[in-house]
Amino acid sequence: MGQKINPLGFRLGTTQKHHSFWFAQPKNYSEGLQEDKKIRDCIKNYIQKNRKKSSNRKLESDSSSEVITHNRKNDSGSSSEVITRIEIQKEIDTIHVIIHIGFPNLLKKKGAIEELEKDLQKEIHSVNQRLNISIEKVKEPYREPNILAEYIAFQLKNRVSFRKAMKKAMELTKKADIKGVKVKIAGRLGGKEIARAECIKKGRLPLQTIRAKIDYCCYPIRTIYGVLGVKIWIFVDEE
């Protein structure tokens, strides 16, 4: 049996880097990890909550059915607002949080960063440390596996065929400068009683080469037939 390893952890220190940068005493290390998880969960919940509010406002404000259907079609682009990664850098008196996101439309609104900072302060109860949040826009959104996985999830929840959703995601990668991509979906595909896996691959994908920069994500999708698992590998470049 072949033993599968996470492509990101396999390349940690060569082509991949840590998302948290800080030092702590051994007795305080677990508290630092829990604080990082609270920060990341709070930011993701804030994005999801505000995205739902903005989509509901659009549907309520548009009276004609033509405009409503047009907005629903455009919601497929909301997958680009997915957070690709959150980097946390801790100093003695400051916590720097860098949010990497596709198109930061929600966080660019007036007062959004201040509101997010207040939520984080309540969550982590940091009295002696101040928060510094910055937004980094991803240059090539469709080179990020998290964004492609969210796009596939949106298509499947709208009852689009899984094969069609996979092909559309592969087409989006043509806009990005990559050398290979692999998309795999497993579960009760199409509502079938027996679970199976479908896979599409394009280009090169040297998983055994450590110097190859490969981005990877595993994303669960909850449907009426159960949970589907989406895995995406993207071969960016070779160092």
From Swiss-Prot:
It is found in: Plastid, Chloroplast. Keywords: Chloroplast, Plastid, Ribonucleoprotein, Ribosomal protein, RNA-binding, rRNA-binding. PROSITE patterns: RIBOSOMAL_S3. One of its GO terms (molecular function) is structural constituent of ribosome. SUPFAM superfamilies: Prokaryotic type KH domain (KH-domain type II), Ribosomal protein S3 C-terminal domain. Coiled coil: none annotated. GO terms for cellular component: chloroplast; cytosolic small ribosomal subunit. It comes from the Eukaryota. One of its GO terms (biological process) is translation. Residues 43-139 form the KH type-2 domain. Part of the 30S ribosomal subunit. PANTHER family: 30S/40S RIBOSOMAL PROTEIN S3, SMALL RIBOSOMAL SUBUNIT PROTEIN US3C. Belongs to the universal ribosomal protein uS3 family. This is Small ribosomal subunit protein uS3c.
